[in-house]
């Protein structure tokens, strides 16, 4: 029996929600280990759609413990709102079903304000953030001045920590011409929200270690995609945390040996939200068609996603940097009806053929995709639950992807419904 880490293998929005829900039904514990409420995921269960952004997917499954790990930055006000919103759909979240790492960093109003100011102040330098304060909160964490969940329980220490935090932020705000933050007001806001957060606080690394030693199945749920990883992504057009599978250990407090099977979620084509390089982007009618069919709009922001052909070179990179054992291929049905389909196998840079995306921002902007064209299929793949139901050309497309990325398909998703899934290998049985 293996614990399972789920990571997006592209730029996010790969369809992790459905796959995580499918796995969560078999898990005892589901853990979020990085990011914040900047990346949404959609679950469709018994015809009911749940949209989550901070809460782990396990919250909609009875009998599953959900955990927000220390690698996550937590907006306490958003968390309270999300718990209430999910509650209106009949999902009861209590301290018995949700635990939050007491050493997790908090996102504060000043982080959201700074994020918004930076992103709108200079259009030529914008990264394409969600303006939700994620980056500035991580900056404070690394700068050792962050307010953490545990600090909400100590009013005296909280005041001292706010004073230290504002020594930095108010100096910065003066330089930017932004009104300074009043420490007393911020403290009052935090003390008001504290009773709604502290009941969920726990020493999560101990809880998870006990679960592991007790033989419980742990599912580590990644947010976004590995190509947005702060080290291994298309820097600087990335998020502010590590997303690759190794972060599951760091962001939860468990050792690397606790990570078992790494499942990469891969869309049958490529999408990206916001700024940054996108070698296979389609700005023509084909790109529009893929976007319309796939309903490619962000769960959190509603922003339209950029669409393009499948980039095997990029996914191959992620397979290596995350140690992916197998993939879940999603949205194959969106490609139904295309006469021909292209797959990017590598790039041309200044006349040279290369098999990976270079780290240089300038080089990333100049690479030209090298395509392989295969015949499409006109039969539907939507709702297929076995290989026998798939058109021969669709199977050929899947097999070619496996060859190019160096990883096999463990699951194949053919619609948003959880049961429309072809199981090749159950990651928990590795």
Curated annotation (Swiss-Prot):
- Which source organism? Methylobacterium sp. (strain 4-46)
Pathway where this protein functions: Purine metabolism; AMP biosynthesis via de novo pathway; AMP from IMP: step 1/2
EC numbers listed for it are 6.3.4.4
Q: Where does IMP bind?
A: 13-16, 38-41, 130, 144, 224, 239, 303
In its UniProt entry, what is this protein called?
Adenylosuccinate synthetase
Q: What GO terms fall under cellular component here? A: cytoplasm
**Entry's Pfam families?**
Adenylsucc_synt
UniProt keywords (A-Z) are: Cytoplasm, GTP-binding, Ligase, Magnesium, Metal-binding, Nucleotide-binding, Purine biosynthesis
Indicate the family of this protein.
Answer: Belongs to the adenylosuccinate synthetase family.
Q: Where is the active site?
A: 13 (proton acceptor), 41 (proton donor)
Gene3D superfamilies from the UniProt entry: Adenylosuccinate Synthetase, subunit A, domain 1 (3.40.440.10), Adenylosuccinate Synthetase, subunit A, domain 2 (1.10.300.10), Adenylosuccinate Synthetase, subunit A, domain 3 (3.90.170.10)
What binding details are noted for the cofactor?
Binds 1 Mg(2+) ion per subunit.
Location in the cell reads:
Cytoplasm
Q: What class of enzyme is it?
A: ligase
